Amino acid sequence: RKISGKECLKILCNKFGFKIVRQKGSHVLIKKETEHGKIGAVIPLHRELKIGTLKSILEQAKVSEDDFSKFV
């Protein structure tokens, strides 16, 4: 199903422990500290994220599509 940038942001922050670092315009930078270092991703707050954009965000955030889809 289609997901908005805002929904994606909520899931990554609430379920995967990311914190909002800053926002510039419609783009939000999130980060998380792990034992392997920092992980970050940029999320555009669009009404509807395209599949490639969502996959790229999940890849940057090191979150599997299966884990993410449990919360959608």
Functional labels for PLM-detected ranges:
Residues 1-23, 29-72:
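Basic nucleic-acid-binding interfaces
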